[in-house]
Amino acid sequence: MRHLTSLKELSKNEILELLDLADNFIDSEGSIRRDPLFPDKKVVNIFCEPSTRTKISFEIAASNLGCQIIDFDLSSSSLEKGETLKDTIDNLAKMNINLCVLRHKDSVIHELIDQTDSMVFVSGGEGSISHPSQGLLDIMTVRHRKDLDNSNILIVGDLDHSRVFQSFIDGMSNFDSKITLCGPKELCKDV
């Protein structure tokens, strides 16, 4: 796995390997430990939609891994002057950015991946399609409390427009748990 764009693309073993890797960064007291494994890597977070928790979580994670975090302020970028996202990514790749975390209202990440092979992409959320990092976090939360293969899980809410719900379902489809869905009819038409 080179990019993380959707949990649909991951096998059960790949998900478990990612969760095991994440668990290795939690110390015996439950705190996240710093381990500067990548001091020569540059990470840019491009968030074309508002975000607090996801954006800051990725910044903290990159910092904990020793990465150089490139501040990308959408409002002062050339995107505001009409530059395309493809051109922005092309320029960042030429600046030797190693990893791009992208949040966008549309499904554009695969087009950008096809454009450059020098940068790794992680989806920080795409429209109502996917949010793989949040899906992995939710699966990890279940795993810390229950067996992923033998749980009963109830999901309540707006299931038609939730990228988090979709990613959780995509990831959990690899496991043998019973998932029950619930919500107002007008918010669960597509389920």
Placement of each model-derived feature along the sequence:
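Glycine-rich phosphate/diphosphate-binding loop of Rossmann-like nucleotide-binding domains
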Residues: 48-60, 143-191
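Short, acidic/turn-prone active-site loops that include or flank metal/cofactor-
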Residues: 74-77, 125-130, 184-186
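Active-site cofactor/substrate anionic-group-binding motifs, chiefly glycine-
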Residues: 42-95, 99
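Positively charged, low-complexity intrinsically disordered leader regions
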Residues: 1-56, 60
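Structural motif
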Residues: 41-45, 67-70, 98-99, 119-122, ...
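Conserved active-site and cofactor/substrate-binding residues in soluble primary-metabolism enzymes
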Residues: 10-13, 38, 49, 53, ...
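Anion-binding alpha/beta catalytic cores of soluble intermediary-metabolism enzymes, centered on
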Residues: 89-93, 97-171
